[in-house]
């Protein structure tokens, strides 16, 4: 007789394979068509709120794998909080202004067409370009299963948003922190605009290294009691800045020496200068820095005076100890020049070429031929003009600032720019902005903790923030200047009127409306007396003000300020984290975030940066089409994301294997609880059930603890270990007999099913933030006992496994199971046995702490465990120094359950006879 029909074999329609690339898009479409985000809000109304403030990606081009890592990580964290019962908010955003978009539009137009085009028309084209990529990227993010307020994103070029960026600027101005200065800043001659520190990249560049003699004036020599040749030797890597030299900085605490051949260098650098062949003479006289202070040397290029000044910035780790100082071309030069009244000479135009001032100020001999010449092409002619004053010249490669967009080397160039002053105190505050920002950092939690040690020193050491740009596509610094006095108008009525016009017409109003139209009705100002400031804001100001425009404005249902979390790549320590911190500290004196998480960058399998030229780019769209977004999401969760991440086809295939393990574990659990109508009471669980429930409780608490601290790698490693070892490796294996062969409603079967149902549901709540699609699919196939009133995954709230006391200490049992497995391994290989049910174990029964005989037999998946056996001994193993012997089972194989517990092979065992007979 075939007893298969009498077995309760697992049943489920939940498919073994997910067919994710085909099925996910349909499910995601349903979610977004029914606005699942709004449903999530409604389901958690009144609950504790978790706010994740989304840092805006740039609306230019398709998303790359780094974008996918970032948004998936945010989605996992948001959903983790949601499934823990919290209300959540994430309003996605896009950065839409700035140079990269201008460049793309310029490329399409051509330079001459762009220059002939009115600013308003050019801005219109930039707006259209950005709008197109907002739509493209939104769809790409949605294809990753990311749930956010996609219907109401923040877009920095929206009219109201531009108005609020401008209002943030006005708030900074009202607090006295907005200043206009003529000072050197990073200048991109290729893009013709100022840059902020966050827009600077460092690349290797070959430059000249030159040593130049500046002869002392006759009056200086007389004061020092010197005759004959005597001059200071400077070192520089930028010969093109020498025409703008107006000073030489020396260290106030150092001694200087005059050599026999007439050169003055720092005593601490003298030996190095001899070694390098810069000077040759004996050090014949020592001179204190204070003796040189205020004396004049002569610039050998143009005979203009160069004043010797004291500067703390002069170091002794290189050069001569005498620093060429051109206040128009360097931050330190400018500071020391300001302190000592040095003239700021700046003969370079926005294209990086010498302008007419080289002629007007006699900065170079035969200056006319230098007008219009690019400064980098002027190095060689200048070296020739130095003649004998050029003591040594060589070339070397060093790390040099480059423009983030054009990739061209930058220069320092003194121009009129707008700055947020870091070392001034906002009105009403007793702290400078720097102090307020540094103090605010101490209130923030950082993951990883080392992230704090990156942000804090950056803020402690940063210069004033240059927020003006000489471009067209951005929010204008929309202030009026009085033509006659150059005074800037900060009249509150005027500022708010301009902001209200931006609300209605966008920042384009600054370009399309006349001054008269931009002034409020009945204004006391005469439009004829005023001019518009033409600069626009740095895009880092746009994104740095999003806490104000999104979280505080009331225009979005975006959550709380300060936000619970900001999460971006580690490059944002000098970007968004910092710009947001400075503006929030300037206006409110607090950080805009409670927690910062940083992640690394995505690399190929060899750990190399991805680039189209290398052909190693992994596009999210390709991954989703090949593997499904769930695999990409699991890759993120299984990544040590705080460091750089490797991704490749092989890595994704390994991730897909882990996904299959999780999926098939749930499939087995679903299939085995399909006929369970009610959970058993707590006292009905057997020893094995209590063991797995206790183990699951500990493991899930540990997983939850890891997830709470955003350590998804550790959490998933803990969960995977449990699934592989205790759950699938032991419990799901050892309980098959009771699930398939016991009577349908037997206590032991229902208890195990109940344990499986509880574990499944708790485990579902832990995987749902990552594998949301799969969790939803599991629920669709789950029996009523499992899902109750749940319609979809977004109805789910994590439920921990009930606390269950362990029924036994499993240490000895796990060791015994492993030793038994090792002992019989050869029996299987040599085909002495086909299955462990053919065996029985004999030994000290009391050493094995499971009291129920059947549970103990199931633990080893054998037909008997007893004190002694008369069956043929085939193996043995030792536990705690005691020997257990393994024997062929004495009884016959039951044709139904295959346990060797029957009197003959034709007869059912006692248990099966009862079940079938009933």
From Swiss-Prot:
Keyword ATP-binding applies: yes
CC terms in the record's Gene Ontology section: cytosol
Primary localization class, coarse: cytoplasm
Gene Ontology biological process terms in this record: isoleucyl-tRNA aminoacylation
Gene3D superfamilies tied to this protein: 1.10.730.20, HUPs (3.40.50.620), Ile-tRNA synthetase CP2 domain-like (1.10.10.830), Valyl/Leucyl/Isoleucyl-tRNA synthetase, editing domain (3.90.740.10)
Ranges spanned by the short sequence motif 'HIGH' region, renumbered to the chain: 57-67
Source superkingdom: Bacteria
Keywords from the UniProt entry: Aminoacyl-tRNA synthetase, ATP-binding, Cytoplasm, Ligase, Metal-binding, Nucleotide-binding, Protein biosynthesis, Zinc
Residue sites binding Zn(2+) per the record: 894, 897, 909, 912
Reaction equation(s) it catalyzes: tRNA(Ile) + L-isoleucine + ATP = L-isoleucyl-tRNA(Ile) + AMP + diphosphate
GO molecular function, one term: aminoacyl-tRNA deacylase activity
Residues binding ATP: 612
Chain residues that bind L-isoleucyl-5'-AMP: 568
Location of the protein in the cell: Cytoplasm
Function: Catalyzes the attachment of isoleucine to tRNA(Ile). As IleRS can inadvertently accommodate and process structurally similar amino acids such as valine, to avoid such errors it has two additional distinct tRNA(Ile)-dependent editing activities. One activity is designated as 'pretransfer' editing and involves the hydrolysis of activated Val-AMP. The other activity is designated 'posttransfer' editing and involves deacylation of mischarged Val-tRNA(Ile).
Assembly, per entry: Monomer.
Listed name of the protein: Isoleucine--tRNA ligase
Source organism of this protein record: Sulfurovum sp. (strain NBC37-1)
């Amino acid at each position: 007789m075939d007893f298969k029909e009498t077995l309760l074999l697992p049943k489920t329609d939940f498919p073994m394979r997910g067919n994710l690339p085909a099925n996910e898009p349909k499910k995601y479409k349903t979610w977004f068509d029914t606005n699942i985000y709004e449903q999530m809000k409604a389901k958690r109304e009144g609950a504790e709120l978790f706010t994740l403030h989304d840092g805006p990606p740039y609306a230019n081009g398709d998303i790359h794998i780094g974008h996918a890592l970032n948004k998936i990580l945010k989605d996992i964290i948001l959903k983790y909080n949601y499934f823990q019962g919290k209300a959540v908010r994430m309003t996605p955003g896009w950065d839409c202004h700035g140079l990269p978009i201008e460049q793309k539009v310029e490329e399409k137009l051509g330079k001459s067409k762009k220059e002939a085009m009115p600013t308003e028309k050019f801005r219109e084209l930039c707006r259209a370009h950005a709008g197109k990529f907002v739509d493209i990227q939104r769809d790409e993010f949605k294809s990753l299963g990311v749930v956010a307020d996609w219907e109401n994103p923040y877009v920095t070029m929206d009219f109201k948003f531009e108005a609020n960026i401008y209002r943030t600027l006005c708030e900074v101005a009202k607090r006295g922190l907005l200043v206009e200065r003529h000072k050197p800043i990073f200048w991109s001659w290729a893009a013709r605009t100022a840059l902020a520190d966050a827009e600077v990249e460092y690349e290797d560049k070959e430059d000249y290294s030159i040593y130049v003699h500046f002869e002392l004036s006759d009056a200086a020599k007389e004061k020092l009691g010197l005759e004959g040749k005597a001059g200071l030797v400077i070192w520089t890597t930028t010969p093109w800045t020498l025409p703008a030299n107006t000073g030489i900085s020396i260290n106030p605490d150092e001694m200087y020496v005059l050599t026999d051949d007439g050169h003055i260098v720092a005593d601490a650098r003298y030996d190095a200068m001899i070694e390098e062949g810069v000077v040759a003479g004996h050090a014949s006289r020592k001179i204190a820095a204070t003796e040189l202070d205020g004396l004049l040397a002569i610039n050998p290029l143009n005979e203009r005076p160069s004043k010797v000044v004291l500067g703390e910035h002069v170091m002794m780790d290189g050069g001569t100890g005498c620093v060429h100082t051109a206040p128009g071309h360097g931050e330190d030069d400018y500071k020391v020049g300001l302190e000592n009244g040095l003239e700021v000479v700046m003969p370079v135009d926005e294209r990086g070429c010498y302008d007419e001032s080289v002629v007007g100020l006699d900065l170079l001999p035969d200056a006319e031929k230098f007008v219009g010449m690019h400064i980098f092409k002027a190095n060689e002619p200048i070296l020739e003009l130095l003649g004998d004053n050029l003591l040594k010249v060589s070339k070397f490669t060093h790390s040099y600032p480059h423009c983030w967009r054009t990739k061209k080397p930058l220069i320092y160039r003194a121009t009129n720019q707008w700055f947020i002053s870091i070392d001034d105190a906002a009105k009403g505050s007793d702290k400078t902005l720097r102090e307020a920002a540094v103090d605010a950092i101490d209130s923030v939690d950082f993951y990883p903790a080392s992230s704090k040690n990156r942000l804090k020193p950056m803020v402690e050491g940063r210069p004033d923030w240059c927020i003006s740009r000489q471009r067209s596509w951005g929010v204008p610094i929309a202030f009026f200047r009085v033509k006659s006095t150059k005074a800037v108008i900060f009249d509150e009525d005027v500022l708010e009127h301009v902001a209200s016009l931006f609300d209605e017409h966008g920042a384009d109003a600054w370009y399309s409306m006349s001054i008269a139209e931009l002034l409020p009705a009945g204004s006391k100002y005469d439009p004829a007396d005023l001019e518009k400031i033409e600069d626009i804001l740095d895009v880092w100001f746009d994104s740095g003000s999003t806490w104000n425009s999104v979280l505080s404005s009331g225009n979005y249902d975006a959550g709380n300020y300060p936000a619970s979390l900001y999460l971006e790549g580690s490059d944002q320590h000098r970007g968004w984290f910092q710009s947001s911190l400075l503006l929030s500290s300037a206006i409110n004196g607090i950080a805009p975030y409670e927690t910062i998480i940083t992640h690394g960058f995505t690399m190929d399998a060899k750990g190399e940066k991805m680039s189209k030229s290398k052909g190693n780019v992994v596009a999210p769209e390709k991954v989703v089409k090949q593997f499904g977004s769930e695999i990409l999401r699991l890759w993120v969760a299984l990544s040590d994301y705080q460091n750089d991440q490797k991704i490749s086809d092989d890595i994704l295939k390994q991730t897909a294997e882990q996904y299959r393990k999780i999926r098939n574990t749930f499939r087995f659990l679903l299939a085995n609880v399909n006929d369970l109508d009610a959970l058993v009471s707590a006292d009905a669980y057997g020893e094995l059930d209590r063991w797995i429930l206790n183990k699951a409780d500990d493991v899930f608490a540990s997983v939850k603890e890891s997830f709470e601290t955003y350590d998804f790698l550790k959490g998933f490693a803990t969960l995977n270990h449990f699934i592989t070892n205790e759950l699938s490796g032991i419990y799901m294996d050892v309980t098959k007999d009771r699930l398939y062969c016991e009577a349908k409603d037997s206590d032991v079967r229902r208890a195990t099913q109940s344990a499986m149902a509880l574990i499944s549901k708790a485990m579902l709540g832990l995987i749902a933030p990552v594998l949301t699609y799969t969790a939803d699919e599991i629920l669709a196939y789950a029996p009523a006992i499992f899902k109750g009133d749940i319609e979809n995954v977004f109805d789910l709230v994590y439920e921990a496994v009930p606390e269950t006391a362990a029924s036994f200490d499993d240490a000895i049992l796990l060791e015994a199971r492993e030793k038994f497995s090792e002992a019989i391994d050869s029996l299987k290989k040599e085909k002495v046995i086909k299955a462990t049910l053919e065996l029985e174990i004999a030994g000290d029964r009391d050493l094995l702490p499971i009291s129920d005989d059947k549970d103990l037999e199931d633990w080893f998946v054998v037909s008997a465990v007893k004190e002694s056996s008369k069956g043929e001994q085939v193996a043995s193993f030792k536990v705690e120094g005691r020997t257990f012997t393994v024997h062929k089972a004495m009884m016959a194989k039951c044709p139904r359950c295959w346990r060797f517990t029957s009197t003959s092979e034709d007869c059912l065992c006692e248990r099966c006879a009862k079940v079938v007979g009933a």
